[in-house]
Each structure stands twice: as structure tokens, then as C-alpha cells.
Curated annotation (Swiss-Prot):
Residues 119-138 have a biased composition (Basic and acidic residues). Keywords: Membrane, Transmembrane, Transmembrane helix. Its main location: membrane. It is found in: Membrane. This is Uncharacterized protein R01001. It comes from Rhizobium meliloti (strain 1021). The keyword Membrane applies. Residues 109-145 are annotated as: Disordered. The keyword Membrane applies.
Length: 145
């Protein structure tokens, strides 16, 4: 879950910083809205603290949020696969334009590539959903002293 949040943050940061590298975009952005960097970071810091406080007060909200991010991650992965296949059909040369049903490198014979039912059961995880670590409270000073 945190990987998706971090990846979204860094991707957004890249999109924000790209116009600084292109001189023609600075002319377009001169007439756009202005912002203060310090105020923006302060607001982001307060938003993170607020969200952290919600997770401590109402853990069920964070649990649902984690489930939502997992579902969005699966959708994003499927979307990336669809985009890859589309780009592969548009820009690949020759016979490579047809998407492969199964990628084969030639190191495994087709008979060996079919997994047995027993091997599949051993390879599957024992849990069905991704475990999410809970927020730990600070131990604070010991009251028994």
C-alpha cells in the first residue's frame, strides 16, 4: 500500500518538476497560478499528521483504505498490462506485433512448464489478503517506577 502512495507522490513530483527543464513551458506558466513552496510543504505535513491521527483513532478506516489501495494496485497493474500490449502492437516490428500468450525463453521445455496441482498448492500463499502492519503506539515512560 505504501509503495503505491510513495510511487504516486514521486511520479507527481516528476510531473511538477518537468516544466522547469523545458524553457518553452516557462513562458506558458508565467501567466498561471502562483504558489508558495513553504506553505505547500506545511499543508502537506499537516495532511500527513491528520491522516496518521485518523489511523490511530479509527483503525477500521485505515483497514478499508488499505483494502482500497490493494484493489487499486491490482487495477493499475492490469491497466499497465493493457497499455503495454497496446504499445507493443503499435510499435513492434514484424511478428512481434502479435501479443504472446505465454512468454517462453527457450530454456524450459513445454512439458516442464506445466505445473502440477501439488506444486501449485505449495506455491500459493496461505492467506488471501495482504497483511497490513498496524500503527504501534510509543511505549512512553514506565508507570511502575
Amino acid at each position: 500500500m505504501w509503495f503505491l502512495v510513495k510511487a504516486t507522490f514521486w511520479f507527481s513530483l516528476v510531473l511538477v518538476l518537468l516544466p522547469f527543464l523545458d524553457p518553452s513551458s516557462s513562458e506558458k506558466l508565467e501567466h498561471g497560478p502562483k504558489m508558495e513552496i513553504g506553505g505547500t510543504f506545511s499543508a502537506a505535513n499537516e495532511a500527513i499528521q491528520y491522516i496518521s491521527a485518523i489511523c490511530v483513532e479509527k483503525p477500521d478506516v485505515c483497514e478499508k483504505g488499505a483494502e482500497t489501495f490493494v484493489a487499486l494496485g491490482h487495477r493499475a497493474r492490469e491497466g499497465a498490462r493493457i497499455a503495454y500490449e497496446f504499445l507493443n502492437t503499435q510499435f513492434a516490428e514484424g511478428d512481434a506485433a502479435a501479443p504472446d500468450v505465454k512468454v517462453m525463453t527457450g530454456t524450459v521445455t513445454p512439458a516442464e512448464s506445466v505445473p502440477s496441482a501439488e506444486a501449485t498448492e505449495k506455491a500459493e500463499p496461505a492467506f488471501k489478503r495482504m497483511p497490513v502492519p498496524e500503527h504501534r503506539l510509543d511505549p512512553g515512560p514506565a508507570s511502575g517506577k
